[in-house]
From Swiss-Prot:
Belongs to the cytochrome c oxidase VIII family. This is Cytochrome c oxidase subunit 8B, mitochondrial. One of its GO terms (biological process) is oxidative phosphorylation. Its main location: mitochondrion. Keywords: Membrane, Mitochondrion, Mitochondrion inner membrane. Liver and heart specific isoform. GO terms for cellular component: mitochondrial inner membrane. It comes from the Eukaryota.
Length: 10
């Protein structure tokens, strides 16, 4: 499974 980078909520 390819882990996707967690996006930081603004």
């Amino acid at each position: 499974i390819t882990a996707k980078p967690a996006k930081t909520p603004t």
